[in-house]
UniProtKB/Swiss-Prot annotation:
It is an enzyme of class 2 (transferase). Its EC number is 2.5.1.18. Residues 4-83 form the GST N-terminal domain. SUPFAM superfamilies: GST C-terminal domain-like, Thioredoxin-like. One of its GO terms (biological process) is defense response. Coiled coil: none annotated. Glutathione binds at S14, K41, V55, E67, S68. It catalyses: RX + glutathione = an S-substituted glutathione + a halide anion + H(+). This is Glutathione transferase GST 23. The keyword NAD does not apply. Gene3D superfamilies: 1.20.1050.10, Glutaredoxin. It comes from Zea mays.
Amino acid sequence: MAEKGVKVLGMWASPMVIRVEWALRLKGVEYEYVDEDLANKSADLLRHNPVTKKVPVLVHDGKPVAESTIIVEYIDEVWKGGYPIMPGDPYERAQARFWARFAEDKCNAALYPIFTATGEAQRKAVHEAQQCLKTLETALEGKKFFGGDAVGYLDIVVGWFAHWLPVIEEVTGASVVTHEELPLMKAWFGRFLALDVVKAALPDRDRLLAANKARREQLLSA
């Protein structure tokens, strides 16, 4: 039985949705998950997020919260007694938010052209993405996780890289996160994906691979 009033409106292949699931699982919160067909959005989704009409949406006691990073912070604030997601120190919290925003604004944008480009354009996109990830990697120096000795807010925000990027690399033939170029990031991939709470929420890799292959073919033929 899911905890009263806790529901996640998501989409199985969305790396933004999995952030919410990881946060809830780390906190030990049971929830109902509703997988949305984004080509035919449900009345529930449109009612709970009429502004952007996007997933994820967390519905808690009938009140909707949208946008994945905002939802993760909300979860940490509501279920205070569980696993700490945000750092306790104000400065460390600010740093975590800074790097999360950097990853959202810069790294995500740098990675997308790899998926949509070929040839020289793709090689340029790979280089630019690697430079962005190298900057992000500095936040890992001397640490096991971005959160320190344990997974924290920034790990949750960028955690999708560990599962989705290898899929994107296979689909596109590009090599982005390598031991040579991004050794700390590559090692973190392994540590992060080894965690039971992380693995439990991951979408099936073969299904994700097939979906991304189909999507890329569609984009390249457009």
